């Protein structure tokens, strides 16, 4: 059984967010004591805005933490390498992951924010691309294969050595697998996107 919010301890917090470096988190809490005003279960730090520089909290691998929300079980981390930079979203409840389609699929597209809002999403990202003939596409024609709540859309990308497309599948038991685009979609797949 789940603990009541008032019973959540620091150890409970770090059991879920094991990626967070405890010393840097404690330093942040020392500087921002209001963070614990509602206990460990009430932690909701968000310094991920475009005009914000993130927190002083680090992961155990040294990445900067941008946001952590205990209730939603989400962690945002700034990641960077020689040829990339971005934000890694760590969602601790895989049952909440889903692929959602534009309401105008086949006619027009929507922004990722509009799709997320329509489906009660907390975090969102684009999945499949869309066909854009002559740069005149409107986002309504799906590129590649996708599945949303067990309903398949589009056609699979052709897998070649030069273009090794893959498919991200979320299964009905809420596990995730990545498969080649030329492999059959698993029978227990509920959501998928190809890239």
Give residue spans per PLM region.
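A substrate-binding/cap region within the structured catalytic cores of diverse enzymes
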Residues: 155-195
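Zymogen propeptides
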Residues: 1-160, 167, 175-177
